Amino acid sequence: MKKEYYSNGRKKYLTEVHYLNENGKLNNENGPARITFYKSGKVEMEEYYINGKQHNENGPALIKYYENGNIRLYQYFLNNEVQPLNEKNLVCIEYYENGKVRNELYYNKETNETKNIMYNEDGKIIK
């Protein structure tokens, strides 16, 4: 089932689209289950869910965009748990509006340790 939400309940501009299963939980096996929009109509955020749990086996389960369309953030989840993207354990990457990496978050599930690397807009590590 697809539900659309508009500002002030009127069709002034689309603010969110939800895809729900028969139990009313966010669910879409073929794309994002929740999409939010800027007033301009451009996509602000896409969230992937299966049976109410943030989940995407083929990429990030959370994608945020700047209004200019550039990626703001990728975050990886499987079954509502943070899931490392690769053997380096990257779970979240955030970008500046110009497209350069701002922040990388790594998580080791075995040791429960996190590592955060922050960059300035020139690409130099600051933390």
Task: Give the positions of each predicted feature.
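Glycine/tyrosine- and acidic-biased, solvent-exposed loop/turn segments at the edges of beta-strands
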Residues: 1-127
